Regions:
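Short, well-ordered strand-loop elements centered on a beta-strand within folded domains, enriched
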Residues: 223-236
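Loop-to-helix element that buttresses phosphate recognition and phosphoryl-transfer chemistry
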Residues: 16-74, 147-165, 207
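Phosphate-coordination/substrate-recognition cap region in phosphate-metabolizing enzymes
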Residues: 42-136, 142-144, 195-219, 242-243
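Short, cationic low-complexity segments
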Residues: 235-243
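Short coil-to-beta-strand
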Residues: 7-16
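Short, Lys/Arg-enriched N-terminal segments with co-localized hydrophobic residues
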Residues: 1-5
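Active-site-adjacent alpha-helix immediately C-terminal to a catalytic or transition-state-stabilizing loop
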Residues: 9, 67, 75-77, 150, ...
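Active-site glycine-centered loops adjacent to acidic/histidine catalytic or metal-binding residues
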Residues: 14, 88, 186
Length: 243
């Protein structure tokens, strides 16, 4: 009998959210899934179920779109393991752009500037005022966080640093011990993890687009090295960047 030791990391960006549909900068604001987003989450659960592997640990961000995506997946898998919620896996904080329409801001600031805000490595938008109701300091779920942990704005680099720190401290060792992990997170937190795992440079990361609701499965060999990576929903994976 040959026993193959392998672990799997499944990364999924939450299903389509209400503000994805409205083309708004969402960041740390809590908006739920659209009906389409719920369908994406259920479909994700189905394609993960077809793998026939046991998921040992589940993680989500503090945000309802990530939490509910994971709930739909776990319900489909009939897996009742208590998920870990980590604010460090939250979406990038978009500062003063939060709640604004992307198309309107392109007209106001120019397409180039908005592209820089969205895709550059270390550019931060102006900070969000603490008086703004969308500021995390005014949202109940973040009351447990220290004030030094709550950002007013973030670059992708800032997001990368908190996401990767959390991954190294809480998830990396579990992968090395042949655990299967599923993380339900966000476009920029998953881009950050991909930069770290696949050793992407700053130019490559700007081109990486993460689709909603399509699980990316990364396989690790017995030495903890990546041996394979693919999107599980084949119908939607044709034009996606896969390493």
């Amino acid at each position: 009998i040959i026993i193959i030791f392998m672990s799997h990391l499944i990364l999924i960006r939450h299903g389509q959210s209400e503000w994805n549909l409205q083309k708004k900068f969402t960041g740390w604001v809590d908006v739920d899934l659209t009906p389409e987003g719920k369908l994406e989450a259920c479909k994700a659960g189905e394609v993960i179920k077809e793998l026939n592997i046991k998921i040992d640990h589940f993680y989500s961000s503090f945000q309802i779109r990530s939490i509910n995506t994971l709930k739909f997946i776990q319900d489909t898998l009939r897996n009742k393991i208590q998920p870990v919620k980590a604010w460090q896996l939250n979406e990038r904080h978009y500062g003063a752009l939060t709640g604004l329409n992307k198309d309107e801001m392109k007209k106001k600031l120019g397409e180039k500037k908005i592209h820089e805000f969205r895709r550059s490595w270390d550019l931060r938008p102006d900070p969000l005022s603490k008086n703004n109701p969308y500021h995390p300091i005014n949202i109940e779920v973040y009351k447990s966080l220290g004030k030094e942990d709550i950002p007013d704005t973030e670059s992708l680099k800032d997001t990368y640093e908190r996401v990767v720190k959390y991954y190294k401290e809480n998830i990396e060792d579990k992968i090395k011990k042949n655990n299967n992990i599923l993380i339900s997170a966000h476009g920029n937190s998953i881009r950050s993890l991909c930069k770290f795992l696949f050793k992407l440079d700053e130019k490559q990361i700007t081109k990486l687009e993460i689709p909603t609701g399509n699980p990316m499965m990364i396989e690790f060999d017995k030495n903890g090295k990546i041996s394979n990576c693919l999107y599980l929903d084949k119908e939607r994976a044709q034009d996606l960047i896969v390493f």
